[in-house]
Amino acid sequence: MHSRLPPVTQALLIANVALFLLQSLLGPATFEPFALWPPTGLFDPFSPGRNFQPWQLLTYGFLHGSLGHLLFNMLALYMFGAPLELTWGPRRFLAYYLICVVGAGLCQLAVGWWSVSSGGPVYATVGASGGVFGLLLAYGM
């Protein structure tokens, strides 16, 4: 493998770490509209709060709940993302990664909707795990 990180892998690592630092400095409430919330009511673009908004299908994948959460996701992104990007090229790699993030988000929305409609608690989903597990799957194949 090359000694330098491929550009998209490097950009994803930097973006995730930078956003985690911002989360730590500004507090979690600032980023609530960007976490993935289950659908609990009607879409309201003027009151994002704790309800699903379409942009959350991408933004949740760049937020993390703790330093350990961030470190393990970024380690896996480095380990599996760099070789895949070198094999596929940056465009295909980024498209695949983002499709995995959105796909995992859609699955989580379905589970969250079921949980909330069954009387379960409303909670946000954050983290790059959906994208990372997609990379792990591709790497393993």
Feature locations, PLM:
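Cytosolic juxtamembrane amphipathic/interface segments immediately preceding
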Residues: 1-2
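N-terminal TM1-TM2 helical hairpin plus the immediately adjacent luminal interfacial "cap"
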Residues: 5-126
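Membrane-interface micro-motifs in multi-pass membrane enzymes
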Residues: 121-141
